[in-house]
Each structure stands twice: as C-alpha cells, then as structure tokens.
C-alpha cells in the first residue's frame, strides 16, 4: 500500500523500553520506528487480511492515518490542529457479496485521538490499534486492533502475531516511489501475520482465525506530478513467501514508476527495480456509485514469477471523501501462478480511477 491521504477536509485552512530490544535495520530503529513520526507530513499503519469462521470467509481492512497540517501549535495553543488522525475499516463478506466500511477523523489530542511515538499505539475515538513485543519472542510483534461500526453492522477485536522478521521495503527501508530524488518514503511490512479474535457480524459474535499483512509507511514526499494514482498488491503466499508489487500510473494508464519485493520464508528480501515489474490490467468492473472502472483482474510479471491477481468480489470500492478525501478500491484477492493454481491471498489496492489523486 502507498501513502494515500488525498485531500484535507474541513480541519485544514505499557510498552517495552527501547533498550530491551532496540535494533538498527537500514536506518530504521525498532521499536521506536513502530511508532509515529510527527515530523513527517504523512504516515499510515495498514492491516489487511482474510478471516474464517467455519466455512464462512471475510476480508478485512483497518488503517490509521496521521497527517501533519503544518500549523504551529504556538499560534493557537493546544486547540490548533497540528496533527490530524483518520481511520478506515472495512469488511468484505464473500458469502453475502457485500463490502461494509466506515471511517473516522479527529484532530490529535483531547483524549480523542493519538498516535504515540515510541511504539505503535493508535487511538481514534473508539477505534484503536497497539503493538507489544510477542510474549514468546521479544524480537517479534503482537498487534491488537479493536473496531466497531454501527453503520457498517460489524465489529472486530483481532490479535495479529508476527511469524517472520520485519520486511524492509526498498533499499533497507528507503522505498522509491518515483524517478525523482525526493520520491521516497520509509516503508516496512509485516507479512504472514497469524490472526485470531472475535468478529461481530450482524449482531452475532464469531470466533475467527486468519492471515494478515501490515504496512507502516511515512514520508514528506508526494506521488510524482505526472501520476494520477497507483495500483498495489500485498500477497501472503501459501508457502510462507511474501510478494509486493506496485506501479504509479499516468492518466493514459502507462507506468510512471514501479517496484516491489519478494521474500521466501527464512530468506533475504529481493527488491524489484522499476524495469523488473509489469502490472497489466485485465477484466474491468464499473462502479454503479462512482462510475469509475477498475481492473479487477491483473497479470503481474516480476523476477519472482508471473502471476494473476483475481478479486474475490468486484465491488470493494470505498468512499472515504468524509475523511481522507478519496474514492478508491481495496479488496481481498487471490494470487494464481501461471498454471492457474491458487498460491496465495492478499489485498489489491487501486486509486485514481474515480478522480486523479492530488496530494
């Protein structure tokens, strides 16, 4: 997933001490870099995955965004909106063929919203997500996310446990997002998270298990001026591997820049250069709500292989104009190999199809 706060709405004119398991990885220092970076203009923590209870399956998303407004606190005291927090949550009901979603927005502070800087600790009204070291391995993470949506008719309280080391995207965590020298972000992933917890769906509590993917990214940079949006996948493969691929896209559909990575379980990450990744759109679906046309099938060529991505539900479009200002597509999808066999599952994200992203 790429940084995606598209517009600013009306607001704009007990953790382990660092010394317990601090480590430096390519300029990123953990656990501090699990936390917020208020000096960066834009930042997000993003978790997507699949859930199962019996034979029934769902996809889910929970994302917290932090945006620095550039307004000095001294100008208006503690009431000045120096930091804004946003959150999105979504649930894809495969059996019911329906996406449910909700969103939140608030200025930081006043006991309403916060993003702490020493570790992942995010609160936005009644939604929250936090990280602690795993009780079985202090070098790995355990996350907990709690979300409830009356309008969406769902709630979840989920625990995510890391099974692999942190995956540093790009060059040791410095990820290129365009041809320019400043088109970069700090970016790491935690793929292959095991999930367990409770999903409340249409008033019925269900114990669920699953697999998830977490991204954390922050930057002062924006997408290149010639880009109108992007296409991205984060896939957990059944053999324990993790695949990322993305492209930033011009209005004519050509790529401004592309990248990604692949890591087999227990091995080093292989980052992809812009000439090594090709994302080719296939079958299209038109949204009745926005009239945007999205490719819900993709062919993706990488040094790790050639794959097909198939959306498991066509209508996974989210309207976030009440918070981050964009309409985008974010949905549970399968990953197929060249023989058409399913080899993984994860999320596909597409932006800039309803309207060009302006950041």
Language-model-derived ranges and their functions:
Residues 1-20:
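N-terminal export signals
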Residues 21-359:
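Structured soluble/peripheral alpha/beta segments that form catalytic or ligand/cofactor-binding pockets
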């Amino acid at each position: 997933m790429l940084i995606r706060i598209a517009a600013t709405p009306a607001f704009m004119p007990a953790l382990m001490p660092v010394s317990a398991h601090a480590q430096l990885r390519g300029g990123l220092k953990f656990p501090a870099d699990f936390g917020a970076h208020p000096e960066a203009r834009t930042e997000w923590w993003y978790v997507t995955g699949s859930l199962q209870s019996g034979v029934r399956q769902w996809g889910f998303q929970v994302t917290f965004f932090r945006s620095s407004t550039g307004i000095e606190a001294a100008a208006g005291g503690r009431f000045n909106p120096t930091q804004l927090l946003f959150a999105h949550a979504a649930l894809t009901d495969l059996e019911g063929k329906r996406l449910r979603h909700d969103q939140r927005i608030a200025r930081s502070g006043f006991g309403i919203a916060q993003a702490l800087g020493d570790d992942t600790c995010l609160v936005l009204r009644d939604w929250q997500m936090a990280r602690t070291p795993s009780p079985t391995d202090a070098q790995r993470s355990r996350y907990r996310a709690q979300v409830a949506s009356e309008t969406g008719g769902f709630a979840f309280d989920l625990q995510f446990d890391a099974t692999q080391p942190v995956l540093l995207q790009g060059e040791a965590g410095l990820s290129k997002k365009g041809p320019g020298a400043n088109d970069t972000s700090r970016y790491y992933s935690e793929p292959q998270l095991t999930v367990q917890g409770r999903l409340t769906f249409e008033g019925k509590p269900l114990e669920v298990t699953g697999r998830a993917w977490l991204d954390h990214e922050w930057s002062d940079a924006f997408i290149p001026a010639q880009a109108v949006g992007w296409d991205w996948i984060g896939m957990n493969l059944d053999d324990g591997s993790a695949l990322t691929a993305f492209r930033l896209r011009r209005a004519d559909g050509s790529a401004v820049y592309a990248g990604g990575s692949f890591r087999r379980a227990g091995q080093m990450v292989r980052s992809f250069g812009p000439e090594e990744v090709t994302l080719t759109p296939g079958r299209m679906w038109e949204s009745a709500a926005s009239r945007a046309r999205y490719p819900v099938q993709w062919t993706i060529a990488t040094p790790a292989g050639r794959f097909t991505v198939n959306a498991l539900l066509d209508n996974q479009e989210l309207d976030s104009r009440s918070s981050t200002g964009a309409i985008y597509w974010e949905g549970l999808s399968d990953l197929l190999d060249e023989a058409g066999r399913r080899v993984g599952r994860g999320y596909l994200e597409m932006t800039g199809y309803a309207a060009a992203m302006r950041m």
